[in-house]
Regions:
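Extreme N-terminal leader/targeting segments of oxidoreductases
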Residues: 1-33, 48-56
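Short hydrophobic core segments
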Residues: 35-37, 61, 226-231
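N-terminal Rossmann-fold NAD(P) dinucleotide-binding loop
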Residues: 42-43
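Glycine-rich FAD pyrophosphate-binding loop
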Residues: 50-72
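Short loop/edge segments at beta-strand edges and connector loops
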Residues: 62, 147, 202-204
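Dinucleotide-binding Rossmann-like beta1-alpha1 core, especially the glycine-rich loop
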Residues: 75-157
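A short, glycine/Asx- and small/polar-enriched loop/turn
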Residues: 124, 154-168, 210-218
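Helical element adjacent to the flavin cofactor pocket in flavoenzyme catalytic cores
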Residues: 172-226, 230
């Protein structure tokens, strides 16, 4: 089922009787082409393998429930304001994915580009932000170096006085950065991957690997062992 205004209205009128589970609870197959361990980043990996590369016989194995690991315990910040060029290009490409993710996955991940500000409390720290900001602009990434007056106008209530416990002498802002709801991201990728045929196996812990010489051919789990050509 594709989520839409029509489906919301239809289910609102019939007492929410027609909603289907966001993803299946399948029994594991005897073998898979790919087994991915971990239902956090693993869900995105499975989705793009299925969508971009046509690999559909995939299992994502999660020892708990989806979102119970690190993906459900993070700062929710989405940004590309890093110092190194390699990091900037990597995270800026990720930012572009975030901007269309809700549409691409047909699920509201609550991505909000409200901006992020890093505050400088001393001259060495401000110098680091100046260097980072210059590098960002060289790579075409938006950023602004702000003085205390500009910060005060941008963030009412921020204590920029000289008597503040942690005096603020400036800050670096990236307006395109923001936040996303991590639970919604997990559910969105799980639903989208499931619709492409990916099996999501929850409450299934990997306890070891099956090997043929130096080659890994499968995984041992708390729900039987599974063969795989790739891990």
């Amino acid at each position: 089922m594709r989520y839409s205004a029509f489906s919301l209205l239809k289910n609102a009128l019939n007492g929410n009787k027609d909603w289907k589970p966001a993803w299946r609870k399948p029994d594991p197959k005897p073998a898979y082409d790919v087994v991915i361990i971990g239902g956090g980043h693993g869900l995105a990996t499975a989705y793009y393998l299925a969508k971009e590369h046509g690999i559909r016989n995939i299992a994502v194995v999660e020892k708990g429930w989806l979102g119970s690991g690190n993906i459900g315990r993070n700062t929710t910040a989405v940004r590309s304001n890093y110092l190194l060029t390699e990091n900037q290009h990597f995270y800026e490409a990720s930012m572009k994915l975030w901007e269309t993710m809700s549409h691409d996955l047909n699920y509201n991940v609550m991505f909000s580009q409200r901006g992020v500000v890093n505050l400088a409390h001393n001259l060495p720290q401000l110098d680091v932000y100046v260097r980072r900001g210059n590098q960002m602009r060289l790579n075409g990434i938006d950023c602004e170096l702000l003085n205390p007056k500009q910060l005060e106008k941008l963030i009412p209530g921020l204590d920029t006085s000289a008597s503040a416990r942690f005096p603020i002498i400036g800050g670096l802002m990236q307006r395109s950065a923001g936040t996303a709801r991590h639970d919604a991201v997990v559910w969105a990728y799980a639903r989208a991957a499931d619709q492409l045929g990916v099996d999501i196996i929850e409450n299934c812990e990997v306890t070891g690997f099956i090997k043929d010489g130096d080659k890994v051919t499968g995984v041992m789990t708390t729900r039987l062992d599974r063969k795989s050509t790739r891990l």
